[in-house]
Regions:
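Alpha/beta hydrolase fold serine-hydrolase catalytic domain that processes acyl esters and thioesters
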Residues: 1, 19-155
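Gly/Ala-rich beta-loop-alpha elbow adjacent to hydrolase catalytic centers
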Residues: 3-8, 12
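Active-site signature of alpha/beta-hydrolase-fold catalytic machinery across serine-
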Residues: 14-18
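Short glycine-/acidic-enriched loop or helix-start segments at secondary-structure transitions
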Residues: 12-13, 42
Length: 155
């Protein structure tokens, strides 16, 4: 099993996609916990197809990060005690009897916002996409915060 949260979820799926065939066969499941997707090119070859049925995505009901970029897998939506972007913190995800409390789906307004953001991102040339992501992380880094709670307090 390979698992990760946020960028770690993206990296788990990416590593499994490009692993050697022998390694891919040994991976039983890939879990991406509110991890972003990929650019469409990742899905074009056979590499991703070899693992697709083993990829499990778990997202909070107001997910932003996990809905970024292209995603082909179905996803499970869970309840969260967080509000907005704070739902990205997996410690806010609701658990009952050792299992995630399931939500019906991603909120409709969040889906619309995610679609608009993704449409915009996909219009950018590769260099500008990279610059956007790097700048976003630099801005967050400059705040000096280390948790989403701290981030929301200073926002």
């Amino acid at each position: 099993m390979v698992c990760g949260h946020s960028k770690g979820g993206n990296l788990a799926a990416y590593a499994a996609t490009w692993a050697e065939t022998g390694v891919q066969r040994r991976i039983t499941d890939i879990y991406s916990l509110d991890g972003p997707g990929f650019l469409p090119e990742v899905f074009e070859g056979d590499s991703y197809e070899q693992i697709r049925s083993r990829v499990h995505r778990i997202l909070p009901y107001s997910s932003l990060v996990g809905m970024l970029l292209q995603n082909y897998e179905q996803y499970e939506v869970v309840e969260s005690s967080g509000i907005g972007i704070l739902q990205h913190d997996a410690f806010t995800w609701q658990i009952e009897d050792g299992k995630f409390v399931k939500a019906v789906d991603i909120e409709a307004k969040q889906k619309r916002m995610n679609e608009a953001l993704n449409q915009w991102i996909f219009t950018l040339p590769e260099e500008e996409r990279q610059l956007f992501v790097e700048t976003l992380f630099q801005v967050i880094d400059q705040t000096g915060v280390t948790t989403l709670t701290e981030f929301s307090e200073h926002w």
